[in-house]
Design a protein with these regions (language model features):
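Basic, glycine/lysine-rich polyanion-binding surfaces/domains
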Residues: 1-190
Length: 190
């Protein structure tokens, strides 16, 4: 599937509150606390101590999405020139370190597309399609979760007070960006 990496990304509205993020390395890890400890040492990022939280170190992050599910993101600085090679090397290093420990490790780098929604109305715009309470007190900086945006599954991560990282399946990217554009119409120019 090398051609997937060279496909053009879905059109993203040219508004300052939304932007397409560069391709990144994405690996899903399912494993218990022992696997998490080994993976953290290899990945170079400590895993969060609390569920639905993310940790970031340099250009890598870990998002705790479920009881034994973690999304590992790499190349968040946009410096993933050879995405496939880096993802394969990272997955190989993790697989080798985890050895015979019960775990599942899957490279999903090409499956997803990432958006950044930012600005003073970011939470309100996302609330137009997301059922979660995105008030800063309820969904603080560093929180992440699987949820939906209208009919699309997404991973939502609040990276700063008014900045959200949204992971969506590539096949739903046009749908999600279109809905974001419609919802944001009332905020144009503000």
């Amino acid at each position: 599937m090398p051609e997937v990496a060279t496909r053009s990304l879905p059109p993203v509205p040219q508004q300052e509150w939304i932007s397409a993020l560069p391709p990144a390395m994405r690996i899903i890890l399912h494993g218990d606390v022992g696997a998490r400890s080994v993976a953290a040492a290899v990945w170079g990022v400590d895993f969060a101590e609390q569920s639905c939280r993310a940790t970031l170190k340099g250009a890598r992050a870990t998002l705790w999405l479920g009881p034994d599910e973690y999304l590992l993101l790499g190349g968040l600085d946009g410096q993933v020139a050879t995405l496939e090679t880096q993802a394969a090397e990272a997955a190989g290093a993790l697989e080798l370190a985890l050895g015979r420990m019960p775990h599942a490790l899957v490279d999903i780098s090409h499956r997803q597309f990432a958006l950044q929604v930012s600005g003073p109305h970011a939470a309100t715009i996302l609330s137009g399609g997301c059922p979660l309470d995105l008030d800063l007190n309820e969904f603080p900086v560093g929180m992440c979760t699987r949820t939906v945006f209208a009919k699309a599954d997404i991973v939502l991560w609040r990276t700063q007070q008014d900045v959200f990282h949204v992971e969506v399946w590539r096949s739903f990217a046009g749908y999600v960006t279109g809905l974001l554009r419609e919802i944001a119409v009332e905020f144009n120019g503000t």
